[in-house]
């Protein structure tokens, strides 16, 4: 009697199974709270895995945070994972500590006269977003009349921060009081502050620059104002300066007071009735794609015989006639016309070579960093500029110029401790440490570079052929 074979189980139809239920949990402030915890650990010295030596000072940090914020640290730690890093002597300790605070917290408060030093360090660390925003801040401050040079005994402060509401950068400066750090969820980005002044004192201006994100295709060239050429009569070269001009008329924008929430422990400042001719000013700039441009407005000659060039940058959507001028001494020589072009030496790649400068024998130290200009592109097509005055036709050459001017050697060999300025130099050098030498199985010749070994192996026909045709081993 045959035993019936059991039938295989029939799989359930997929239509019968209910769809799996999923839930999603999201914490919008998770990234900021995580960075705050990392910053607190850094300040307490917990879980730090790298020591940074800057001009004799030792700062503790986390390798993962440094590598994520700076391409310089990313490549340096990738090539040599050492517990202690010594930064070049050109990096100032105070400026680097400020940028380290910016990396961990997303905000930085500093005196305005220290802004060029922070720009210099950010260029060396290849933090191009910070360099771009510092250049924008310098340009906006000069355009609005609030330069770096302090007037009288007033101390100017700047607050550089990243805001989650606008996704950009903002800066506030006030000659009378330190700005209040505000939260994007509790106050309006366009809020204003009223400085306190005694009887007979001038009412200080509160400057607020807010960056608004904008898509690339929505750029509007009509909003950019062309900067006018000016000649500076100051004898000191290589400096950026400016003062707050007194306005002579009412501000064209209607100003409305916005209530603000102050942190605990701080009292609200006394609000004085502002004269109609001196209201606080608010300037807005738009964040554009990082394509630095440059516009040479003219050159002039000082009475002492030293020729200086003034680089003028357009002011954007601001009011006033202020400009940002970089004075570049070119040494004694024939003078050129007021705004006419002059012949300048160029290198093998067609880039301008500015004589003189801020080297060891120069009068000052040149400021290097990418600049972004408005207006029409130059006729020669070199629209990527550096703060030192050089211009380049392509962006990689400009970035390479900034790296080489600092004499930094960030790329080090982990085997022989040799250091190189450029990454491809290290790549070529690492071929010498490829391990065992490549030996030809036919003639026994040995090669260091694998590509040379492959070419020889295709040509080699044995020991006799190699002896007859090769005069060296």
Swiss-Prot record:
This is Zinc finger and BTB domain-containing protein 9. There is a cross-link at residues 286, 293, 307, 382 (Glycyl lysine isopeptide (Lys-Gly) (interchain with G-Cter in SUMO2)). Residues 211-226 have a biased composition (Acidic residues). Residues 177-279, 293-376 are annotated as: Disordered. Residues 355-364 have a biased composition (Gly residues). SUPFAM superfamilies: beta-beta-alpha zinc fingers, POZ domain. Residues 227-239 have a biased composition (Polar residues). One of its GO terms (cellular component) is nucleus. Residues 182-196 have a biased composition (Low complexity). May be involved in transcriptional regulation. Keywords: DNA-binding, Isopeptide bond, Metal-binding, Nucleus, Repeat, Transcription, Transcription regulation, Ubl conjugation, Zinc, Zinc-finger. Its main location: nucleus. InterPro entries: BTB/POZ_dom, SKP1/BTB/POZ_sf, Znf_C2H2_sf, Znf_C2H2_type, ZnFinger_BTB_dom_contain. The keyword Membrane does not apply. There is a cross-link at residue 286 (Glycyl lysine isopeptide (Lys-Gly) (interchain with G-Cter in SUMO1)). Residues 48-112 form the BTB domain. It is found in: Nucleus. The lineage of its organism: Eukaryota, Metazoa, Chordata, Craniata, Vertebrata. A zinc finger (C2H2-type) spans 411-433, 438-460. GO terms for molecular function: DNA-binding transcription factor activity, RNA polymerase II-specific; identical protein binding; RNA polymerase II cis-regulatory region sequence-specific DNA binding; zinc ion binding. It comes from Homo sapiens (Human). GO terms for biological process: regulation of transcription by RNA polymerase II. The keyword Magnesium does not apply.
